[in-house]
Amino acid sequence: MDIRAAEISAILKDQIKNFGQEAEVTEVGQVLSVGDGIARVYGLDNVQAGEMVEFENGTRGMALNLETDNVGIVIFGADREIKEGQTVKRTRSIVDTPVGKGLLGRVVDALGNPIDGKGPIVATERKRVDVKAPGIIPRKSVHEPMATGLKSIDALIPIGRGQRELIIGDRQTGKTAIALDTILNQKPLNVEGAPEGQKLYCVYVAIGQKRSTVAQFVKVLEEQGALEYSIVVAATASDPAPMQYIAPFTGCTMGEYFRDNGMHAVIIYDDLSKQAVAYRQMSLLLRRPPGREAYPGDVFYLHSRLLERAAKLNDDEGNGSLTALPVIETQANDVSAYIPTNVISITDGQIFLETDLFFQGIRPAVNVGLSVSRVGSSAQTKAMKKVAGKIKGELAQYREMAAFAQFGSDLDASTQRLLNRGSRLTELLKQPQFSPLKMEEQVVVIYAGVNGYLDPLPVAKVRAFEDGLLSLLRGKNVEILNAIRDSRDLSDDTAGKLKAVVEAYAKTFA
């Protein structure tokens, strides 16, 4: 075989010329100690607060405590594989998550990774999870209704797009049921081809719940056809505390994508008590000083910076909105505990759910007297304002009278009338789960209640009366419902027609 020296030297020269000196410089630190989901790391002198770091085995973590001689890192995953002396490298990126419409219909973990087995997520953008809330100038006052489909809420405690309304109550009082019904009620708005200004996308963040509970929730959404316009972010009870802490921020960032692009979204945090507990655990393990109930001093800021991101933006910013429905679980109806008082003071109103009402069969178990919406009737349609104004006053009087009526047996006629009306209105506000009503249907039902058409009926017949009236209006008299829906008002002409229909129906019903 003939070896040509010139040819070999030419090849060698070519190889040397194209030899890439690609040395990657990464800043690394060393694990000093690890345990309870917290790693102390020496080095990483230039790491940023909130920066994502990577351990040798690929597990991610987030730098939270920047001290003089070490960095406290919370670990997003199991800490079993991480050993003392291993290296940790910076990623130079603050914790972020994929955003966009590609997430709709998916179930993701607290870092935005899919956990539903439907393949990778199609997302073009990534956003930081912890960003500053919009200032005062880009905002606009809340004025559009965000219908939940529940009579007791839409009539008495109306929620507007861009509002923050707290759902608070003991365990097993139906807090998640209200959230679920609210998501299901958006189905008619999210039909194919509907204008973006009408649609309302839903983000549900499950924090510290059982996996079976989250799976059940997703199953209901799927069965009812609501998953296609929803995103579920799940940090279950078996996930480490840092995941439960970051999940609400991840969900909020996904919701903000819609808000900032002129669309509308609602986000449900279920529940923030568990996020506060996870944050307390992390803070204590990082040796931050404890405060009231052993929560850290900045637990108020934790929730306020999250909930301030829900906003209604003005026309220059695209008119989008993000509505927040945080859930808080109380212990034995104690709303004066630390976390409940904090969140009550941050939000624009609260829906109180009570165990006693729940067991009396009043479901949704809303205590109408203690619940408020600080946005109020500016978030209601004109039609609803006209009929719901009366019901508030009548129920307030009923509650006052009912307390006194327990003492005396001989009541005058007007008091008796008031008690009768109140008990029927209370019955009218009951509603089974998964059966949200459209705004126009709620208006006609409440109209019948406040105008005395239920007074002659026994309380047990109220539900049957309501169902019959609605099926009559959906069938023969659908033009009345359409008129209320299209004008969003109850004009004198429509009210006259409605009165005639209800009167005729009431006569036949007896």
Curated annotation (Swiss-Prot):
Q: Topology versus the membrane, per the UniProt entry?
A: Peripheral membrane protein
- Report the subcellular localization: Cell inner membrane
According to the record, the signal peptide region is none
Q: Which Pfam families match?
A: ATP-synt_ab (PF00006), ATP-synt_ab_C (PF00306), ATP-synt_ab_N (PF02874)
The source's superkingdom equals Bacteria
Site, as annotated: Required for activity: S371
Citing just one GO molecular function, the answer is: proton-transporting ATP synthase activity, rotational mechanism
Indicate the principal place this protein occupies in or around the cell: membrane
Mind telling me which CDD domains this protein's record contains? ATP-synt_F1_alpha_C, ATP-synt_F1_alpha_N, F1-ATPase_alpha_CD
KW Ribosomal protein (keyword) present: no
Reactions accelerated catalytically: ATP + H2O + 4 H(+)(in) = ADP + phosphate + 5 H(+)(out)
Q: Subunit details for this protein?
A: F-type ATPases have 2 components, CF(1) - the catalytic core - and CF(0) - the membrane proton channel. CF(1) has five subunits: alpha(3), beta(3), gamma(1), delta(1), epsilon(1). CF(0) has four main subunits: a(1), b(1), b'(1) and c(9-12).
Name by which UniProt lists this protein: ATP synthase subunit alpha
Gene name of the encoded protein: atpA
